[in-house]
Amino acid sequence: MTIAKELKQKSNEELVKLVIKLKGELLEYRFKLAHGELDKPHLIAKVRKLLAVVLTILTERKLNWQVEKDKYKLLSRKTNELIVNSWKQKLSTKPESKQETKKAEVKPKVESKPESKQETKKAEVKPLKQETKKVEVKPKVEPKPLKQETKKVEARIETKTKVESKPLKQEVKKVEAKKSVSKPQKPVKAKMIKTKEKKQ
């Protein structure tokens, strides 16, 4: 047998005592674990699972007991007599044949149809106006060409080598500076700082 089947055979009192015992063991194991004295930490998980099974069995029994109690509720004599009389009336009266009931229902419907046609009016339907928003499209701006053109400057490099017994002279290179035109800089505006003079 499994553990759950064995536990279901026990009475409620035995299960309550088992719950108290398991809660005590669980507290003891957790205390030992906190102090580092617990050698088998898997015992905590086993106790928790067993405790869950026992509590589940107890709640099932409690719910079943409440359902059974509500199901077989005793009724008073007056309510019993009313129920019995209503069933007797339903059984004693014979329903009319199906064809007779259909014919009776059809006649009033035919008479009521012309009246309903005269009373109906057509509803006027107005078309909905859709609001359209006008969007202004700005023309694309083409980039303007630069007013100042860049000037190309050629640089000449001359190298002279002289072989002499005198100390060596460094080679002379003449490089002309290239002129490059960049965007004109914006003039910097100086801001004046106003200071309040103390009144005397």
Swiss-Prot record:
Residues 186-200 have a biased composition (Basic residues). Pfam families: Ribosomal_L29 (PF00831). It comes from the Bacteria. GO terms for biological process: translation. Residues 108-200 are annotated as: Unknown. One of its GO terms (molecular function) is structural constituent of ribosome. GO terms for cellular component: cytosolic large ribosomal subunit. Residues 1-107 are annotated as: Large ribosomal subunit protein uL29. Keywords: Ribonucleoprotein, Ribosomal protein. Residues 92-200 are annotated as: Disordered. Gene3D superfamilies: 1.10.287.310. InterPro entries: Ribosomal_protein_uL29, Ribosomal_uL29, Ribosomal_uL29_CS, Ribosomal_uL29_sf. Residues 93-179 have a biased composition (Basic and acidic residues). Belongs to the universal ribosomal protein uL29 family. HAMAP family: Ribosomal_uL29. This is Large ribosomal subunit protein uL29.
